[in-house]
Amino acid sequence: ALFMTSAQAEAGTGCPLSMTYSAVPALRTQPELAAEWEPLLVAPAYDGRLAVRDEKSSALCGMAMTEKQGGSDVRANTTVARPLEGAGGPGAEYELTGHKWFCSAPMCDLFLVLAQAPQGLSCFALARILPDGSRNAFHLQRLKDKLGNRSNASSEVELHGALARMVGEPGRGVTTIIEMVAHTRLDCVLGAAAGMRLGVAQAVHHAGHRSAFGARLVDQPLMGNVLADLCLESEAATVLAMRLARAFDEAAAGDERAARFRRLATPVAKYWTCKRAPAHAAEALECLGGNGYVEASGMPRLYREAPLNSIWEGSGSVQALDALRALARDPGGLDVLLDEVGEAAGVEPRLDAFVRGLRAELGDPDTIEARARRVVERLGLALQASLLVRHSPPAVADAFCASRLDGDGGLAFGTLPAGVDAGAIVERHRPGNDAGYSREATSSGGGELDVDAGA
């Protein structure tokens, strides 16, 4: 929740924050490195000095995986790692030579880097400043001129014999760094949900204070439909992001079932939530009319930020195929995820029918790769609907199931069916509504959402 709040205020800080905290699980595979760096990485202060580690009060950690010829196919990387002494191995020093096409937050003190060691692709920890105070052979070539997220620098880097230490086992670099990637994917989901919440806050606030044709915009039926639809998408994204975050915490505490849920739910949530963000931002901007197209409103920046989380840490197709890999490696993981969905079984007939159709689609393995996006989309919708049925007011769950599961809605935002209580849904999301996301905000039903996602 705190990450989402921060991301609404300034999205550019999300990347270095996410990478820094996500690096901790990967570093723990090499205990001596974790002992050196973890206290600095989790320190709450910011020390922006380019200084040797022992002089720092805190540190940031980035990662450098992507190369121009490989992109998401990191096994095609050509950066070479040569051991300085003997055969090398975990914790040993290496010289790294090569390039990295995308390296965000290049001011970081430490980077996790993938490079080809003699035994295969391996993970390395590369410090910007060496223990003797000299700069490592980590050379910035230029900063990327990006569509959005411009307050977070992204660079191209060349390594000319840069010194680094191996993290984890040789030849198992992807396995070592994948835990970091999983955590940054969670933050992509949180970031996308945060962007939707910001868009809703701006649109609802504007519509509540702007009058046209004799009435406030928020009181006009068609605008109410648009706003309610945006609110539904935002709330669905938030509850899914929070449920996934809970699974990460439970898995870290040793809950095997939570770990299996997390493995499949992460690419599902990353794909679906992040895919919805750009269209959501565009519609929220349009709610402000011409004023939304002006930089001073903040909406153009939100619009430019919106596609990024879908690209970072593996684009849409990468996530869909990763979900298929998770299904193939652990078929029981699907049962765990559907058990979560099934906690709402018998409450909402449209959800029950949707799940039956989903099971039928999953039963056709011959064409599933071509249908991967569709399957993952439907898994995401099923999870969102189940969470809303269990934790949100009936007005929200009913509108979501009608428009997303039952086909009683159009392809654009603002096409909710007749009978939806748009006013109640919008009021629930109005900035300054202290009731937040509690069920009591719009309903007399019992229970509250696990997390005050209204933040």
Task: Describe each PLM feature range.
Residues G91-A137:
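A short core secondary-structure module
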Residues E340-A441, G454:
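C-terminal amphipathic alpha-helical interaction region
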Residues S134-H160:
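Flexible, small-/acidic-enriched active-site or ligand-binding loops
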Residues A1-V52, S104-A105, E305, W312, ...:
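Internal helix-loop-helix
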Residues R260, Y271, K275-P307, E313:
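Extended amphipathic alpha-helical segments with heptad-repeat/coiled-coil character used for oligomerization
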Residues E235-K270, E286, R359-A372, V376, ...:
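C-terminal helix-coil-helix/basic helical segment that borders enzyme active sites and/or dimer interfaces
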Residues D132, E156-T184, A201-V218, P331, ...:
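A glycine-rich, basic-preceded beta-loop-alpha segment at the flavin cofactor/substrate interface
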Residues L302, A306-A345, V376-Q384, S392:
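C-terminal catalytic subdomain
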